[in-house]
């Protein structure tokens, strides 16, 4: 492992600290911890609770030391980013890889997956640096060669290459000035076309089936593949779990791609509970087939635990809690890409670059997953005269998402889709009914 840099957040800026200051900081933290651990005695339970809350202040300063394998330490050499930011990107890619694919038998494929994630991370907050339409050379990587290093010899090689290029195309547009163009406008409108289309587009946006395929490849399980219906259910579980937990993170980002920006918010807890239960049932049904544990492991870790284990999230900064509503400070830090987050603020700009859009549609077999071009053409101008569509997308205010605002009638149809999830899951995976009493 390679230690890269130790940094601390002071006034929303990263600075490098010396070992001596690091030691001083640890001593200070120890002193604070001792004072916080003193018992609070008060006969009035309300006063006691208030005192306990006051004794646990928000973490204002947190130090991180980034670790990652030497295999990726010299990547991004020619890319104009600060060294400390590169260190954070490498560590984020390593932590994500270890969380969502905890087991591996093929190190070379594993490293290729890390590099895929490095490219994806940069696309998410520095979209102007990534243009998959212009070149196969991205950020110093040969994209096709990296995808081949991960998937060559697997049944999903070509399909997953298109999946990842779609992710890069849309994600980089969203995180750059290109989001004011025709492609991203039509893309966000199409997200709200139907719940099934939404989950397929969110699947790609989250690299969900892509990571399932990567987990199989990194464990040399080249003989396993899923049907389209099976991929849809597996990724719907993962995306629903993740988006339920990341609800406030996504609002802080003004996100267009979050399940509960469209699904009724009051179903968030119920949806999480049902998806978690089905995941445990599927895990038990597949228990005698250890090869499939790689699939379950991804969905399980992606669906929640990464929010505690990865330093990309605010679990430590928010006193070991998950699910805190975003504050103005969090939103402001998101604009500054703290923790590699990215804020999509609304603006009045709209670029009618239909020529670029048409050129991309013509290249859809290379740059879009199967079916996306049809989604964009059919739903790109909106399909409901009551939903609120815009010329350019992003959050207009704090505590808002950045996408289409569904009307009450459309929300009702989306509610019905989510409420029949268990029935849909058991139809695709009948072993759920064979082995367990799953209510339908």
From Swiss-Prot:
Domain of life: Eukaryota
Keywords assigned: Lyase, Virulence
One MF annotation (Gene Ontology) recorded for this entry: lyase activity
Residue stretches spanning the membrane: none
Keyword Nucleotide-binding among record annotations: no
Listed pathway(s): Hormone biosynthesis
Disruption phenotype: Impairs the production of abscisic acid (ABA).
EC number: 4.2.3.-
Keyword field contains Lyase: yes
Swiss-Prot/TrEMBL GO biological process terms: abscisic acid biosynthetic process
Induction section of the entry: Expression is enhanced at 60 and 90 minutes after the addition of the ABA precursor mevalonic acid (MVA) to the medium, but declined after 120 min.
Family named by the database record: Belongs to the alpha-ionylideneethane synthase family.
Record function comment: Alpha-ionylideneethane synthase; part of the gene cluster that mediates the biosynthesis of abscisic acid (ABA), a phytohormone that acts antagonistically toward salicylic acid (SA), jasmonic acid (JA) and ethylene (ETH) signaling, to impede plant defense responses. The first step of the pathway catalyzes the reaction from farnesyl diphosphate to alpha-ionylideneethane performed by the alpha-ionylideneethane synthase aba3 via a three-step reaction mechanism involving 2 neutral intermediates, beta-farnesene and allofarnesene.
The name this protein goes by in its record: Alpha-ionylideneethane synthase aba3
Organism: Botryotinia fuckeliana (strain B05.10) (Noble rot fungus)
